[in-house]
Amino acid sequence: MKIIILKFGGTSVGSLNRIKKVCKIIISYIKKNYKVVVVSSAMSGVTNDLIKKSNQISNNFPNSEKDVLLSVGEQISCALIAGKLNEMGYTSRSWMAWQIPILTDGAHSASRIIKIKRTKIINYIKGGGIPVITGFQGININNRITTLERGGTDASAIMCAKFFNANKCIIYTDVDGVFTTDPNLLNSAKKIKEISYDEMLEMASLG
């Protein structure tokens, strides 16, 4: 069984038309006989809007509740992707981090993934389903939703690749590959040809 993780960033799912294109990309890998696991960010702008709302309603909004609030962004994009895939004739459903579960430790708004339980997702893809997983979040020992550190959705995808023994992990973003720094900010950024899961996790945690 060939497993591929496809991670889509906020720009990639930033509009309904872009989500339709994302679904075509997913199907292209299904046709190549891959079992596809999708990890999605929130639509671009949604997370910032939710943060703005939390700041407007309270000057001291608890991080635990902010995590619950911010987790909604990824749920929206995942539901839209899964809904479109079903319309196109494919079995798909959105998976919240707590349903899998994706286990985290650390402080609210800055947690790290420590384990992803395999059973439900592996059984689902074996049955022909396309899971669409919320990135950037997990649940802690108290069964509370937590959000990850900067670069959290990339980290979610990389950890999925590790725990699901994926053959490939492809991250769709607004730059062409992995760079030493943001090429949109510095012309001196260099493209990295090859990188390990551990190195990717370290880079993702640093944003």
Question: Which residue ranges define each predicted feature?
Answer:
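Nucleotide/pyrophosphate-binding catalytic subdomain
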Residues: 1-207
